[in-house]
Amino acid sequence: MKTPERNLVRRRLGRGGFTLTELLVAMACVGLVLAGLTGLFVSGQQSFLVGANQVEAQENVRIALQRMADEIRGAGNGPSGAAFTAIAAGQTATSLVLQNDWNGNGIIEPGVTTNVNGMLRGEQVTYSFVGTQLMRQESGVDAAAVPLIGGVQGLTFTYLGADGATTAVTANIRSVTVAVRGGPQTRTPSNPCAPYTYAEGNVGVAMIDTARIRNR
């Protein structure tokens, strides 16, 4: 039979040890703490990703919308009375061709470039929505369509007449409403045809603007 003195010696020498129950309880407590910390880390990472993607998406959509609106407003530039439309025939809900008679000869020549304020300009500019990219091509300047922004989830052109009603007649178009929806272009979702999941930084920025064609 062990005496109290011998038990005291064992404790002083660090040979008391732990019971299996104590060890399991300690491991369970550590596991709970680690699970909580992991949850906080994942949540913080997702929140940061959403915020960063939101900023990027807003900037991309804003730049693209402003660029298109500016060029739509300036379309139709040319000598007074020239018989050409500011937007070429065949416009659709996701593409349009803007026209300007930069050399002033009264006709639109897609293969001709003109020096305008020190910059070569083509007489047609095409905007189109392909896949997840907004494409722009300037005739005589760009050999092929150039991506303006990526991460585009939707693009819609709506054509309006002088009375503000929608029109499909090219010669009657006086304004164009442009609606763009996009996400970040530096990352792509696991399924490009579906919206981002929250874990991927789910964002979707939508902007809309109506541009009045000043030369018509």
What is each PLM-predicted segment?
Residues K2, R6-L8, W102-G104, V141-R216:
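Short linear sequence signals and composition-biased patches located at protein termini or domain-edge surfaces
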